[in-house]
Regions:
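N-terminal secretory signal peptides
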Residues: 25-63
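Acidic, glycine-rich flexible loop segments
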Residues: 90-125
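Bacterial N-terminal signal peptides
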Residues: 6-15
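Positively charged n-region of N-terminal signal peptides that target proteins for export
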Residues: 1-4
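A low-complexity, Ser/Thr/Gly/Pro-enriched, surface-exposed linker/loop concept
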Residues: 50-102, 134-142
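Extracellular glycan/ECM-engagement signal in secreted proteins
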Residues: 116-142
Length: 142
């Protein structure tokens, strides 16, 4: 329990510091299965946005950590408004049980990102129509 609280407190401290330095939360949600949690934020200085989604459970084989990643790898997916999406190296969590649930069949839009969720997967794209599809069994980028 102490470890979980430390992770939550460190994550909240990170986001509080980030927001104080010119970032603003532009939206968040979780899937009805509570397996995927997503958040997007805007850099008010650079006028760009970023989005990340984190999975709780994956049944597919997770790629090995990149050589430059000594933290957790494989369960976090991120992208900017433009360009490719990728798996992330991270040492905290974005999962928050208080995120609003995005119901199956519904679409979420914010900051140039569009996500839709079905019973089979979550699909998110950016302004370039690049992004990812996530499910327990398959995580793919396009």
């Amino acid at each position: 329990m102490k470890i979980i609280m430390a992770v939550v407190v460190s994550s909240l401290a990170f986001f509080a510091l980030a927001y104080a330095q010119g970032f603003e939360d532009i939206g968040s949600f979780k899937t009805p299965s509570n397996n995927i949690y997503c958040i997007a934020w805007r850099d008010k200085v650079a006028n760009t946005a970023e989005m990340q989604c984190e999975m709780t459970e994956i049944t597919a084989k997770i790629p090995a950590n990149p050589k430059d990643c000594n933290l957790d790898y494989g369960y976090r997916f991120g992208m900017s408004q433009r360009g490719r999406a990728e798996r992330g190296c991270y040492g905290d969590t974005i999962k928050n049980p208080n995120y609003k649930t995005l119901a199956y069949g519904k679409t979420w839009k914010a900051g140039g990102f569009t996500c839709d969720v079905t019973t089979a997967r979550l699909r998110c794209v950016n302004l370039d129509k690049r992004g990812f599809e996530l499910s327990k069994a398959v995580q793919k980028f396009f």
